[in-house]
Amino acid sequence: PTGDLHCGHARNAAWGDCISRLYEASGYNNYREFYVNDAGNQIVMLGESLISRYFEHFGKEYPLPEDGYHAQDIIDIANQIAEKDGDKWLNADPAERLEYFKKTGVELELKKIEDDLKLYRCDFQNFQHETFFYENNRKRINDCLTKMADMGLTYEKDGALWFKSTEYGDDKDRVLRKSDGTLSYLTPDIANHIYKIERGYDHLINLWGADHHSYVTRMQSALTALGYPDVLKVDIIQMVRMVEDGKEV
């Protein structure tokens, strides 16, 4: 959650809501879950962007990251923090400050998303945070990696941990843990899907944007390797283009 919902998101929401209503009307135990990617570099950029605008509010300089966020909502949130907390964060510990701005940014951006979804009458029963899988020293993620290792699905190479995904339909093996100890995007995603299955769900439908189409095979190969070959279906939703007088807007 690094910004407002746009028309592309609205299309995804409408599609998912229709599928959910059909399943519910057919008597299925359907559960609607919104996955919140709040543990990656984008959230670091969100925090740094907010800090930059917060400093700007007080006439101070703090570099806006090259890959940061420039929209008006970032300025608005930074101003909210300044009005609430005053200038206490100008000289705060950098790590503590970043953590606070990340957390606050995610909370406020997600609140807007939740409010918009309510206006669409698109209700979710759970907002599943990615950071959940990093709690308790990444216990759920580590349990998942241990299970994969015990099943002979991983190997070490160049200091990194790899998944033998080519043995399960992928075009190349995938990194699970990088040589610096950080995780690839795939690893918490595998843990998330296993967590769904552990809660008793035997049919998973994911709605992803078209920019994630190459991700489908690697996720399906991971679940196949773990013994769940037919559990996941992924619908790819193309982006919406808004056109006015023949021109894209």
Indicate residue ranges for each PLM-predicted region:
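NTP-dependent nucleotidyl-transfer catalytic core
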Residues: 1-249
